[in-house]
Amino acid sequence: MRISKANAYVAAIDQGTTSTRCIFIDAQGKVVSSASKEHRQIFPQQGWVEHDPEEIWDNIRSVVSQAMVSIDITPHEVASLGVTNQRETTVVWDKHTGEPVYNAIVWQDTRTSDICLEIAGEEGQEKWLDRTGLLINSYPSGPKIKWILDNVEGARERAEKGDLLFGTMDTWVLWNLTGGVRGDDGDDAIHVTDVTNASRTLLMDLRTQQWDPELCEALDIPMSMLPEIRPSVGEFRSVRHRGTLADVPITGVLGDQQAALFGQGGFHEGAAKNTYGTGLFLLMNTGTSLKISEHGLLSTIAYQREGSAPVYALEGSVSMGGSLVQWLRDNLQLIPNAPAIENLAREVEDNGGVHVVPAFTGLFAPRWRPDARGVITGLTRFANRKHIARAVLEANAFQTREVVDAMAKDAGKALESLRVDGAMVENDLLMQMQADFLGIDVQRLEDVETTAVGVAFAAGLGSGFFKTTDEIEKLIAVKKVWNPDMSEEERERRYAEWNRAVEHSYDQA
């Protein structure tokens, strides 16, 4: 007979752009169980990307159950739960029925570009940069909320009456986990977010960590819709949904990229990581002093512990990373599955002069060109699918180089090495390309899915399962290092070719 052990594990829900995952870690920080499930990507029009919030909630319940059953544990054995999520993705729902008024508008969606141009006016997209750390563009949540209120029949009137709630995905998940319309104990569910997610809305003042009435008024968003902002690490509420994690306390909430930084042990000023997921996201811890970028990066909050000052970060966000490989698989059908791209790309020594610029929804950091669209340059009769596959991998490495260069200028010093995570870092060829194009070591950890592990660490810290960040750092180990194997002359020549290719993507929309 199995003997249960109270509070032996920490759980994490990782609600990502393409799938939802649940993991359990033990006291050594090892993943002992994991389950995941993909959800539909909805493309109603060119440039529009949506998800079904109710499908995602169903998937969350499914993966939590699967992960628990696989190791035969009970809620009694779970010390706490952490939640991490795709950031900026926007849900608006009726607080009386729990029904979304529209699909979730995903962070990649560009339908709000015209709204953003109007708001930015003559001052341009940097108008609120000093206050929010963000540019006025289609990326943050604020313009997405405005679009829903202006375009969904009756939504604005319902919002002004106080009947609608807004949340990024963490808020939607927390609201449902704590009972939804009515908790099982009769209490209302919590309508909250954490500082990292709130910092991605274009509605929060980074210095006060509070919603800014002036920004809300400028976007015509009723503040009654907005969730309470709380620190990332601390007590939220126990799960009150009649499900497999009933009564487990929720003690950590982080946006996905901040969770990855946490999972990499990025607790010290200057620590940096790059996540190779659906997009590419480079974050550098800048300590408790807010630094506003002068080179096309965003300023954000890395995390905040209850009772402590927030820790800030610089971020370079690239919209197309792993999703470019998915496009090669699903749209062009050049590979049967994502991992197959590595072997195909290895069949040629170089890209044959081909470059793929994945500006499918414009270019994000550090260029911020919403007018750009995807292009393939350098095609000749010599080029084949192997060259295109190699160019797709190189596009990820070159885009990262752009962000690393911008971050070095903002920080006043170059990175000495780069820690990486995400599904794509299993691709050894891509990691060698990255080291070559950066000219620094690239380090991969033992567990490459640091987003889920990171928020599990945060929840463990919030519940006392882990006592200090020093304890967490000791659990993190580098598994493999790639050293640069390219001359400086070759590196800069290749980078110049990439920059010429990118210029061909401009003025297309």
Curated annotation (Swiss-Prot):
Pathway, per Swiss-Prot/TrEMBL? Polyol metabolism; glycerol degradation via glycerol kinase pathway; sn-glycerol 3-phosphate from glycerol: step 1/1
Xref: InterPro entries: ATPase_NBD, Carb_kinase_FGGY, Carb_kinase_FGGY_CS, FGGY_C, FGGY_N, Glycerol_kin
Q: Which residues bind ATP?
A: T17, T18, S19, T278, G322, Q326, A423
MF terms per GO, please? ATP binding; glycerol kinase activity
Q: Which GO CC terms are listed, alphabetically?
A: cytosol
Family as reported in the entry's similarity comment:
Belongs to the FGGY kinase family.
Q: What is this protein called?
A: Glycerol kinase
Organism, by scientific name, is Corynebacterium glutamicum (strain ATCC 13032 / DSM 20300 / JCM 1318 / BCRC 11384 / CCUG 27702 / LMG 3730 / NBRC 12168 / NCIMB 10025 / NRRL B-2784 / 534)
State the gene name recorded for this protein. Answer: glpK
